[in-house]
From Swiss-Prot:
Name recorded for this polypeptide: L-carnitine/gamma-butyrobetaine antiporter
Pathway note: Amine and polyamine metabolism; carnitine metabolism
Membrane-crossing residue ranges in chain numbering: 10-30, 51-71, 92-112, 143-163, 195-215, 231-251, 263-283, 316-336, 347-367, 398-418, 446-466, 475-495
Keyword Transmembrane in annotation: yes
InterPro entries per UniProt: BCCT_CS, BCCT_transptr, BCCT_transptr_CaiT
GO CC, any one term: plasma membrane
Substrates-to-products reaction catalysed: 4-(trimethylamino)butanoate(in) + (R)-carnitine(out) = 4-(trimethylamino)butanoate(out) + (R)-carnitine(in)
GO MF: (R)-carnitine:4-(trimethylammonio)butanoate antiporter activity
């Protein structure tokens, strides 16, 4: 038994508790779906109304932290002594592919409809004002602010991993400067790690819960195969198998090649939509939306709507900030891993500038296309959602484009590869966080990574069985609460240690 543990490298205190907790929650959910939905609604209401303001302040403070890194004393510090492991182009593509997935294609195609039909600031639904502000809010939720949060934590983890030469990558390992070695490696650190892992597992499950219906609806459109929960389960199984093949190739091949393919295909598909949908309108709408964003930015940053209580900031801004918070550590660990040898300023600028440009292009093109289809009465999104669900409405926004069959094939392949790259990045981090010893330059065990991807697939199926967007939103928001505090502790620990040990 001792030799087996040494071979697999599993750390029992952070490997088994998340398995047990997630297993119990899944069993309770499947046992009574109606009761689970009641609990989900109560949790969503409590967290968004009681803690929404904290998420908004957190994002603002982290933005100031990004400026401090870029222009402060650590800007020219190098994260490791080696040259960069990946070319700049592959580095940017890997970041883009790992931080986005079919879940992003999901929101990019439909988000603007929700903003227009239930707008903020007391605007009339479907009014001119609501349409003018629709894309601006997407640019806000998927712009520099959240990417700055990721870049700050990526610097922190790269510092601990490559500069301080820490052997284990998990949140508790970075807290030694803040709480001391006794607490970081004791019960407190174990609790922190388990909170992180449970939240991350459910976050990954929500991404699969959003991505899978898109693929199955594509299959129904292309092949006439009825969309069922069983088909969703088959698709998730295919993702896990393909992920295992990628992992067997190692991070260099298994991670970079699908990421590059996914990125090139993304821009190819977006270019097609841009050309055939209406390039002039898209550019005009984007330009106007940037102006709206700049005009409303202070209100957006601190909008909680405590008087009118319309629910927009709770349902969207708080939800998205929780989305970014819950993925921040996991993605920052992965991004730190592929950023060895780069300077702090290079990492911060590369992430914020490159990834903001990528997400802004995606949301502008897809959101503008959806708005045009609605205004021209080509598709009726409310009816599609009511009769068939959100995924069908999204598919119809793509099927309405010229050369619909070729377009749908491209979208189908893109969604499939996009989710493989996401599962690859997430399972890598889960395996790193639950192994006893993964030294600099080593990869976590193959079976551990595959095992985590299987568990995440089960979570995705459970969320799909619940139905609707609310369970997915609640899973993100509830998981974001404990990680909100963990992220703050990691940030403070990095600042404290860097001041003492990262001097000229």
């Amino acid at each position: 038994m001792k030799n087996e543990k040494r071979k697999t490298g599993i750390e029992p205190k952070v490997f088994f508790p998340p398995l047990i907790i997630v297993g119990i929650l899944c069993w309770l959910t499947v046992r009574d779906l109606d009761a689970a939905n009641v609990v989900i609604n109560a949790v969503f209401s409590y967290v968004t109304n009681v803690w929404g303001w904290a998420f908004e302040w957190y994002m603002v403070v982290m933005l100031f932290g990004w400026f401090w890194l870029v222009f402060g004393p650590y800007a020219k510090k190098r994260l490791g002594n080696e040259p960069p492991e990946f070319s700049t182009a592959s580095w940017i593509f890997m970041m883009f592919a790992s931080c986005t997935s079919a879940a992003v294609l999901f929101w990019g195609s439909i988000e603007i409809y929700y903003y227009i039909s239930t707008p903020p600031f007391g605007l009339e639904p479907n009014s001119t004002g609501a349409k003018e502000l629709g894309l601006a809010y997407s640019l806000f939720h998927w712009g520099p602010l959240p990417w700055a949060t990721y870049s700050f934590l990526s610097v922190a983890f790269a510092y601990f991993f490559f500069v301080r030469k820490m052997e284990v990558i998990r949140p508790s390992s970075t807290l030694v400067p803040l709480v001391g070695e006794k607490h970081a490696k004791g019960l407190f650190g174990t609790i922190v790690d388990n909170f992180y892992l449970v939240a991350l597992i459910f976050a990954m499950g929500t991404s699969l819960g959003l991505a899978t219906p898109l693929v199955t609806e594509c299959m129904q459109w292309l092949f006439g195969i009825p969309h069922t929960l069983q088909l969703d389960a088959i698709i998730i199984t295919c993702w896990i198998i393909l992920h295992a093949i990628c992992v067997a190739c190692g991070l260099q091949k298994g991670g970079r090649i699908p990421s590059d393919v996914r990125s090139y295909l993304s821009f190819l598909m977006l270019g097609w939509v841009f050309i055939v949908s209406g390039a002039s309108f898209i550019m005009n709408y984007f330009t106007d939306s940037v102006g709206m964003l700049l005009m409303y930015l202070p209100r957006m940053l601190f909008y909680t709507d405590p008087i009118a209580k319309g629910g927009f900031p709770q349902g969207w801004t708080v939800f998205y900030w929780a989305w970014w918070v819950i993925y921040a550590i996991q993605m920052s660990i992965f991004l730190a891993r592929i950023s060895r040898g780069r300077t702090v300023r290079e990492l911060c600028f590369g992430m914020v500038m490159g990834l903001t440009a990528s997400t802004w292009i995606l949301w502008t093109v897809l959101g503008s296309n959806t708005l045009l289809l609605m205004d021209k009465n080509i598709i009726n999104i409310p009816n599609l959602i009511e009769q068939y669900g959100v995924a069908r409405a999204i598919i119809e926004t793509w099927a309405a484009l010229p050369l619909s069959t070729a377009t749908m094939w491209g979208f189908f392949i893109l969604c499939f590869i996009a989710t493989v790259t996401l599962v690859n990045a997430c399972s890598y981090t889960l395996a790193m966080s639950t192994c006893r010893e993964v030294r600099d330059g080593e990869e976590p065990p193959l079976l551990v990574r595959i095992g985590w991807s299987i568990l995440v697939g089960i979570i995705g199926i459970v969320l799909l069985a619940l139905g609707g967007l609310k369970p997915i939103q609640t899973a993100i928001i509830a998981g974001g609460c404990p990680l909100f505090f963990v992220n703050i502790m990691v940030t403070l620990s990095f600042i404290k240690d860097a001041k003492q040990n990262w001097k000229d």
